[in-house]
Amino acid sequence: MKAVVQRVTRASVTVGGEQISAIGRGICVLLGISLEDTQKELEHMVRKILNLRVFEDESGKHWSKSVMDKQYEILCVSQFTLQCVLKGNKPDFHLAMPTEQAEGFYNSFLEQLRKTYRPELIKDGKFGAYMQVHIQNDGPVTIELESPAPGTATSDPKQLSKLEKQQQRKEKTRAKGPSESSKERNTPRKEDRSASSGAEGDVSSEREP
């Protein structure tokens, strides 16, 4: 799932010359649903959008407050073209979820937003319609979000934390320099005449993950 989040002073959606929804200060979210998206990706994206800190706090400090913190509005628009793959110069959308399935999924996304936040502050366009989306970007500030691919290690928070700790340990090991065991291996040893001959090799004490 992909989303383009824009901080706005106002935004609106028009269909057939008629304005169907509008917001004031807040964020406009263009959402692209992929074939492989599940409830897990949906919940991940809802959390990211609602907690993304793109607003300043009362003291003027930037990137300190989320749309929920500020109690601002959200305008959501389904945008299957975010799942575009170029074939030469021609856009291809085979990675986007089919329309019939995507509509229900998109409605579930809106429902989850409204359940987590204030429902009266969540607005949306018209799924499947030809729309004119008017966005007054504030800044401009535009953030791209993407949920972890289903089935990858990074989609599991516990696994992600484990991988991060492993990487930190590796970095600490490199910073300390050669380990004692490595120093011992590199120290010349007296030849043992009674030992059988054979090929010698260096085996690293650090395993690749």
UniProtKB/Swiss-Prot annotation:
Subcellular localization, per the record? Answer: Nucleus; Cytoplasm
Name the keywords, alphabetized.
Cytoplasm, DNA replication, DNA-binding, Hydrolase, Magnesium, Metal-binding, Nucleus, Phosphoprotein, RNA-binding, tRNA-binding
Gene Ontology cellular component terms for the protein in this record: cytoplasm; mitochondrion; nucleus
Database matches in InterPro entries: Daa-tRNA_deacyls_DTD (IPR003732), DTD-like_sf (IPR023509)
Record field: transmembrane: none
Q: In which tissues is it expressed?
A: Expressed in many adult and fetal tissues. Highest levels in testis, ovary, spleen and in adult and fetal brain.
Q: Which GO BP terms sit in this record?
A: DNA replication; tRNA metabolic process
Which residues participate in Mg(2+) binding? 4, 6, 28
Molecular-function annotations in GO: D-tyrosyl-tRNA(Tyr) deacylase activity; DNA binding; metal ion binding; tRNA binding
Could you tell me which residues belong to the region Disordered?
Answer: 142-209
Q: Phosphoserine modification sites?
A: 197, 204-205
The record's function comment reads: Possible ATPase involved in DNA replication, may facilitate loading of CDC45 onto pre-replication complexes. An aminoacyl-tRNA editing enzyme that deacylates mischarged D-aminoacyl-tRNAs. Also deacylates mischarged glycyl-tRNA(Ala), protecting cells against glycine mischarging by AlaRS. Acts via tRNA-based rather than protein-based catalysis; rejects L-amino acids rather than detecting D-amino acids in the active site. By recycling D-aminoacyl-tRNA to D-amino acids and free tRNA molecules, this enzyme counteracts the toxicity associated with the formation of D-aminoacyl-tRNA entities in vivo and helps enforce protein L-homochirality.
How is the quaternary structure described?
Homodimer. Interacts with CDC45 and TOPBP1.
* PANTHER family (UniProt xref): D-AMINOACYL-TRNA DEACYLASE 1, D-TYROSYL-TRNA TYR DEACYLASE
Q: Which family does it belong to?
A: Belongs to the DTD family.
Q: What is this protein called?
A: D-aminoacyl-tRNA deacylase 1
Species name for this entry? Answer: Homo sapiens
Q: Which gene encodes it?
A: DTD1
